[in-house]
């Protein structure tokens, strides 16, 4: 299915009626027999139909046919722009090959780096657009896209430019994250500190100066970068006034989450090996825990993130696809909601918050996404469901009817707006 570009989508202005509203993730805030008004691409009013102000009663009408309307979903951790795919590596892993064996055979992240460097921007755009479209069709209206498969200034710039282009073409809010400290490129083998010099002193200043960087991330693991090296990246980000995020505690506990908290990171992501000290540090700093059940499932991990501790300390939990070619080649945020409930034992309200209010917070965008509020840009989704709990209940089914992104209507099969 090819989704139209934003320029061809009709305006959502008018009164959306015959609907039920879930303004945020709290079921107690649900409004039945509701209406929502859009003016000039922004939400002007929402509430019970009986309370609709007289000023709007003559406006254009959009019959929701009994649908539930929620905020647009937010996918807050993706690696959507890259060249090629790694299905052969998947087959090797199923046959028992480990990370090092796959790397020696020319696979792993280096294979994606080669493909990404070789592809031009138009090719990367076409491939990423195909990956993005299923997410758009599931009601995603804001997405984070990381670099990290270029590992050179030119190739990282190319990834980030494509990410910006996706946002412009599809009318979706794209938040770009510079992940230059993702892996060591082949030309820097054995010289990790020299590569971090390049990331901090050349790549980041150039890309931030070009307006391509909304946040900075790093892969802090024994097979990635050390606490000291990650700290250098975060210090460089601070010099450029850019917030940070971190891949932390996925494979081991190096203390990455605590480091992220010291730098007031927006989020720490993965967290399968997070301990109580790290949880406490995140709680104090207000750092969001981004859970990535797709990678957990794909890697057949057995170490669960400490959900009970995250709840106990009040750490907000977001959920994301972590779309990437090596460990989470998934393009369904709804499936990740189901997996977060079934694998990580999140409640349905936690899952709903994880793809709305908490995901928006993980992007530093709580004022723009994750809630239905008057004054905000009209980003919302209409669902053919009897209860919002169905969004986490179904898997392999997309109950979306219509998606409104940036004040424009994108209708899907079976929908009428």
UniProtKB/Swiss-Prot annotation:
Entry's EC annotation: 3.5.2.7
Catalysed conversion reaction: 4-imidazolone-5-propanoate + H2O = N-formimidoyl-L-glutamate
Binding site for N-formimidoyl-L-glutamate: 149, 324, 326
GO cellular component labels: cytoplasm
Pfam family, one: Amidohydro_1
Main location: cytoplasm
CDD domains: Imidazolone-5PH
Cofactor binding note of this UniProt entry: Binds 1 zinc or iron ion per subunit.
Cofactor: Zn(2+); Fe(3+)
GO molecular function: imidazolonepropionase activity; iron ion binding; zinc ion binding
Keywords: Cytoplasm, Histidine metabolism, Hydrolase, Iron, Metal-binding, Zinc
Pathway field: Amino-acid degradation; L-histidine degradation into L-glutamate; N-formimidoyl-L-glutamate from L-histidine: step 3/3
Any one Gene Ontology BP term: L-histidine catabolic process to glutamate and formate
Protein name: Imidazolonepropionase
Lineage: Bacteria, Pseudomonadati, Pseudomonadota, Betaproteobacteria, Burkholderiales
Gene name for this UniProt entry: hutI
